[in-house]
Amino acid sequence: MQARFHTSWAELPASLQFALEPILSAENFPAMLTAEQVKTVKNISGLDDDALAFALLPLATACALTPISHFNVGAIARGKSGNFYFGANMEFRGVPLQQTIHAEQCAVTHAWLRGETNLVAITVNYTPCGHCRQFMNELNCGSELHIHLPGRPPSTLGQYLPDSFGPTDLAITTLLMDPVNHGYTLAETDPLTQAALNAANHSHAPYSQSHSGVALETTNGKIYAGRYAENAAFNPSLPPLQAALILANITGENCASIRRAVLVEGHNAVTSQWDTTLATLNALGCSAVKRVTF
């Protein structure tokens, strides 16, 4: 079991520990439970979906990186598939606070990168801020997404964000988590570049059409790729680097162990991810950063 889970693990009920132990002890635990694993854990622990998501929050919170605020937030995104996905807030020293990733963004993006195409609920240990409410309003489940908080009855995103502004106001019909493939190609065969290209092809950028992807290679040779997730309100958009960092951190990778990185984006894109990607990666100690355009 990853060391970051030890403290939270000790506080779990014995029945839940028994049910989760084979899952969390796996060498490459991906910070998610498949639908089949969720079913097994519920049968052993006696918890239903809602109670299990709340019980998993301390483990998700243990994935937080908060060198600035020291305020850890965890989230569990529940997919229509039945899978549960961990999320936690992430902060980075040496770059503007705008590069911060909120727990809800993390859980949603984690699910998206794992291939989930629709969410039914998100459970979080603190009320979602306005930024996160707007970010989640881009999802194809929209205002029907159920939000669960400790000590409160479940509510929908529509109740947390009444009279919202979203994709439909801009006549956008392809929403975040809808399957897409933009069909860009590159002659370059480098696996890291191809991973970034694949991410760009599945990115969500209906407002600027500035599709982009980032792939990170760590010192142990693993590759983590992230896609751009644009938002109708623009500012809550999640850059592709943040998406890649989410996947790396949530699975237990050290974000300071990035050996090289590739950004793939359009050569004449209206917006570019290059400057902020380079600055953030340099702050994380990675100087081998390349931009490739289609």
Swiss-Prot record:
UniProt-listed InterPro entries: APOBEC/CMP_deaminase_Zn-bd, CMP_dCMP_dom, Cyd/dCyd_deaminase_Zn-bd, Cyt/Deoxycyt_deaminase, Cyt_deam_dimer, Cytidine_deaminase-like, Cytidine_deaminase_bacteria
Obligatory cofactor(s): Zn(2+)
GO MF terms held by the record: cytidine deaminase activity; identical protein binding; zinc ion binding
Sites where the protein binds Zn(2+): 102, 129, 132
Active site: 104
Function text: This enzyme scavenges exogenous and endogenous cytidine and 2'-deoxycytidine for UMP synthesis.
Protein name, UniProt field: Cytidine deaminase
Gene that this sequence comes from: cdd
